[in-house]
Amino acid sequence: MDAKNVWVANDDGSEIIRAREIAGASLDYDGNVTVRLTGGDGSAVTIAGHRTHHEGSRPDDFHRQLIRVISELSDAAEAFLVRAVHDEARGWRWATEVL
């Protein structure tokens, strides 16, 4: 997977990382999605966290959904930004936008 043109933002948009730097993704018991970055320092970034009660639970496979979206976008000619969003009708999902 060569995701050179795919970027992932945390839910408030204050951090954006290049998707190809993601070594792994995890979902903790609170529903936070954290990605581990490649490189020797083992850095980790929480990209979906701190939800409120009215937003409900994130799907049990939300971290896998992120990897699937990145994989699907990895061959695209355009650059994309991926971020977690919540709406009342659809619940939690990964939204993409062209950069």
Describe each region flagged by the PLM.
Residues 1-16, 20-99:
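Eukaryotic intrinsically disordered, low-complexity regulatory linkers and tails enriched in Ser/Thr/Pro
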